[in-house]
Every structure is written in structure tokens, then in C-alpha cells.
């Protein structure tokens, strides 16, 4: 093997080792995430998905941890009544204080949808509710879209989150999320270094507040 070939092999090996080490750090970190006990904010945002996210966010609203709740990225076939039944909230509280966004199809879309909602309601501090493994990428996308808004993570923990290495399905989910998180983190860092936020980068694609359906 030539000297250049050896250098390339060493560089590739170091890159692979760094990638694997990064995954282990990421997996351990998300397994240790825990929701804050007495968190409060202007609004609450839940990113639709499994792990009882909606019921957790609804409990925060019921406990008056925020003024309004946005359900971001709701399935188009899910009606407000469907979401109401799943939330466990009273009819009056759901009617007055829950908004439903149907336009987000990924985490970046969640960030855009939330930015429009927060702006329309003049909110500067938000509680973000999503699964623990999805939280790092959510915070980077939301932070890039709304650098002026304070984000409070409220992770929903999966069962046996500490034993992710013993569950092939869970480990695969965390690995997939890690792979998605890396480019998101790079975009976040680049936006910070260049002084650009999501609105400046993709202002023409920003979702309007009117796309979020509320009771008002």
C-alpha cells in the first residue's frame, strides 16, 4: 500500500471510530434525558408520533404550564374530535386552547409550523414535547428556525430507555435518529456561524399562521 493509501485508510478508520463513538454518546445522552419537574412557558408544542406524546402535552396544558397547545404535524385524516378524544382534556379546555397544525411532514416542517404559530400568539418561550431520541434533532431544527425563542425540552421517555443496547428495534431507531441528527446539527452550526436563521434561508417557504387550525 502506498503512503497516500495508508493515510487514506487511517483517515477512514478515524472517521469511522468518531462516528461510532458519537453514536454511543448520542444514545447514552438520549437515554438519560428526563423532563423538568416545574417547567412553564408561554406555549406548549407536541410533535405527533408515538410514546404517548399527546397525552403528556395535554397534561402539561391542563396543569397550566402553558397558555396554549399546538399539535404540530397532525395526520390529515385525524379530525379535531379524534385528537380531542386521544388528549384526555376536557371539551372546554380543548376548544379554547388547542390548535392543530396539519402542514408539517417532517421535523423541519414542525419548526416552520411552530414558528408561525408562536409569532401569531406572540410567544417567546415554548415547551417542546417529543420522544427523547427525537429531542436533539427537534431542538436543532427549532433553534435554527426560531433563534429568538427560548425552547424548553420535555422529552417523553420510552419504556426501558436505559437498556437500548439490548433491544435491536430500539437501537435501530436511535441509530436512525443519530444519522438524521448529524446533518441537522451541521445546518444549525452553519446558521449560527453565518448569522442566518430559517426565515432568512427559506422565507418564501414559511408557513402562514392561518394554516394552523384553532378554535378561535
Identify the function of each model-found stretch.
Residues 191-216:
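Short linear elements at protein peripheries
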Residues 2-6, 124, 212-215:
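Short, intrinsically disordered low-complexity segments
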Residues 89-96, 173-180, 197-204:
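A general structural signal for short secondary-structure boundary/capping elements
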Residues 18, 22-25, 93, 122, ...:
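Intrinsic disorder/low-structure terminal segments
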Residues 28-168, 175:
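A structural signal for short, hydrophobic/glycine-enriched beta-strand patches
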Residues 167-197:
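A transmembrane-helix-recognition feature enriched in membrane-embedded lipid enzymes
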Amino acid at each position: 500500500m502506498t503512503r497516500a493509501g495508508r493515510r487514506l485508510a487511517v483517515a477512514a478508520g478515524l472517521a469511522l471510530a468518531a462516528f461510532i463513538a458519537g453514536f454511543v454518546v448520542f444514545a447514552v445522552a438520549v437515554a438519560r434525558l428526563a423532563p423538568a419537574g416545574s417547567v412553564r412557558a408561554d406555549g406548549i408544542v407536541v410533535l405527533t408520533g408515538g410514546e404517548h406524546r399527546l397525552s403528556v402535552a395535554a397534561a402539561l396544558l391542563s396543569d397550566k404550564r402553558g397558555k396554549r397547545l399546538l399539535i404540530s404535524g397532525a395526520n390529515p385524516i385525524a379530525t379535531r374530535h379524534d385528537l380531542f378524544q386521544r388528549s384526555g382534556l376536557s371539551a372546554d379546555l380543548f376548544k379554547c386552547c388547542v390548535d392543530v397544525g396539519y402542514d408539517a411532514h417532517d421535523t423541519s416542517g414542525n419548526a416552520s409550523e411552530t414558528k408561525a404559530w408562536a409569532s401569531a400568539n406572540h410567544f417567546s418561550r415554548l415547551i417542546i414535547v417529543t420522544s427523547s431520541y427525537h429531542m436533539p434533532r427537534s431542538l436543532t431544527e427549532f433553534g435554527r428556525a426560531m433563534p429568538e425563542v427560548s425552547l424548553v425540552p420535555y422529552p417523553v421517555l420510552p419504556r426501558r430507555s436505559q437498556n437500548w443496547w439490548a433491544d435491536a428495534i430500539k437501537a435501530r431507531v436511535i441509530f436512525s435518529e443519530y444519522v438524521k441528527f448529524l446533518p441537522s446539527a451541521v445546518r444549525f452550526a452553519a446558521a449560527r456561524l453565518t448569522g442566518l436563521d430559517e426565515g432568512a434561508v427559506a422565507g418564501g417557504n414559511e408557513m402562514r399562521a392561518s394554516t394552523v387550525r384553532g378554535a378561535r
